[in-house]
């Protein structure tokens, strides 16, 4: 998505696995890395409560900055709304820093496209 100009990636989840703390721990490991590696804002949320099939969803919501830092989060097991000010200047600061913006240095010539797999 970054290759196509994405600055914000929205990641809605409907994952019943784990409790709010386990979900948050997993997200901190994976989503902060995705934001950092791609120099984008990540906005993620998970369904909360039980659905008609009896699956219980632990909730969770967070916004991560392009440097991988958590800007705002809510790990409480209840419905909520988060507000975050996503500033273009924050995105530019990371993307203009030679030691923090790795995307331009990738080497797609060293690997083939997933679409080329048979």
PLM regions and their residue ranges:
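CN hydrolase (nitrilase-like) catalytic-core segments centered on the catalytic cysteine
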Residues: 1-81
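Cysteine/selenocysteine-centered motifs that mediate thiol-based redox chemistry or coordinate metal-sulfur cofactors
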Residues: 3, 91-118
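A short, polar/charged loop-to-alpha-helix boundary motif
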Residues: 78-96
